[in-house]
């Protein structure tokens, strides 16, 4: 017989989600909904003076922040896809990932320095402070900027393009939320970054 649950609701401001916590009689948490959290980007950009391609995401996901590196969710296809494009084995460690990027003249960073977000949901992003991309653009010869997904592209166009005066090409997101795109379809579209 399943234990009965007790629901406790805490109401936030009208635009925020109501936090619902279900407790079993022994007070174990069963499930919760997400509420807004203010996140500040904690990773340095990956680049060197030989970088030619810049790939921008939005902001590290919850799993990425837990793993202390970009694209840290095990179902995100970024590292598997990039390895396939570079004709290498999929890197496992931060050092291997960084080394692969730099060997292939690829820089990565994100468009958001800080924002309010629910979990890892890009659609919930608000109150954005953008990153200063000149940190990269002034120190290497970036020939093309790519967005990993529509949200990264839209945020770049809104916040960074007026300052950089550089166009961005939007590629389909490698996020597990973009399940409509198989790894093969992503490979076909992303292959332009190494042309």
Describe these PLM feature segments.
Residues 103-151:
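Internal catalytic-core helix/loop-beta-alpha segment
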Residues 20, 33-52, 74, 121-134, ...:
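C-terminal capping/extension of enzyme domains
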Residues 152-156:
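Short, well-ordered alpha-helical microsegments
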Residues 10, 19, 27-28:
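Short hydrophobic targeting helices and cationic amphipathic motifs
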Residues 63-124:
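Short, surface-exposed acidic-centric catalytic microdomains
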Residues 6, 15, 28-29:
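Charged/polar low-complexity intrinsically disordered segments
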Residues 52-58:
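Short, hydrophobic/glycine-enriched beta-strand segments
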């Amino acid at each position: 017989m399943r234990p009965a649950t007790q629901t406790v609701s805490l109401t936030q401001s009208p635009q925020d989600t109501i936090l619902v916590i279900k407790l079993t009689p022994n007070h174990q948490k069963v499930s919760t909904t997400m509420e807004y959290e203010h996140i500040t980007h904690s990773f340095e950009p990956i680049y060197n003076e030989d970088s030619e391609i810049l790939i921008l995401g939005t902001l590290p996901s919850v799993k990425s922040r837990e793993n202390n590196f970009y694209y840290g969710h095990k179902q995100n296809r970024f590292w598997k896809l990039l390895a396939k494009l570079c004709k290498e084995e999929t890197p496992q460690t931060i050092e291997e990932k960084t080394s692969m990027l730099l060997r292939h003249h690829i820089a990565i960073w994100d468009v958001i320095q800080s924002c309010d977000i629910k979990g890892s949901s890009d659609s919930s992003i608000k109150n954005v402070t953008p990153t200063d991309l000149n940190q990269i653009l002034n120190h290497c010869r970036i020939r093309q900027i790519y967005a990993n997904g529509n949200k990264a592209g839209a945020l770049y166009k809104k916040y960074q393009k007026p300052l950089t005066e550089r166009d961005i090409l939007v590629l389909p997101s490698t996020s597990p939320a973009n399940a409509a795109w198989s790894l093969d379809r992503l490979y076909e579209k992303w292959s332009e970054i190494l042309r």
